[in-house]
Amino acid sequence: NIIFVSVDTGNVNQEFYDKLIADVKKNNFGMIIYIPFSTASLAIEKNINLWLTDVPTNWKETFNIGNNDLSTLLSLLICKNWKGEIDALIINKNQNLKFPQTDIEDIKTMVRFPNKTNISVKNGDLLSNVKKYRNADVNIFSVDDDMSTAAMINIVNESRISGIFCVDSNLENVLV
C-alpha cells in the first residue's frame, strides 16, 4: 500500500505531514510526497535526478540498498513514462563505504537501470550536493529517518527543482 500526497508549500501544516510520515513508517506503508517548486514545470528536459542515501556497506551481500527502493522504482517508472534519462547520485557520507566502478556497474545491472543512466558517487551531505546539481526536471529522494517536512521543503526551495520524496514500506526490493 502506498499513500500519495502533494504538499502546497504556500499553506502547509508541517506537523500533520510529519505525523502522517511517522504513521506510514509504523504501519509499513509506502508514501510518495510531491513538493512542487513554485515556478518549475515537469518533463521539459525529461531529466530525473535520483538521490540514493545511506546505502549500507554490505549492500551486495544483503541485496539491500537501504531506504532507496521505492524512490528507485518510482524513478524507473517516471523515466519510462517520460522517455527520459536518470542520473543516479549516490551520497556517500560514510568514509568506510567505497564504490569502485565494478560496484557502480553492479548497481546498474541489479536495478536494471536504462542504458543511458549515469551513476556517480558524491561525497558530503545531501543538501549541499542537491544545490550543485540543478540540471533536472525533478529530484527524487528517499525520506531518511531524521528528515522532516520542513527539511523536504527546504531542499526543494534550495534546489529550485520540484521534489518527490519516498518513504519505503520495507516490503519492496528494487534489486534482482
What are these regions (language model features)?
Residues 1-176:
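Membrane-embedded alpha-helical bundles that form conduits across membranes
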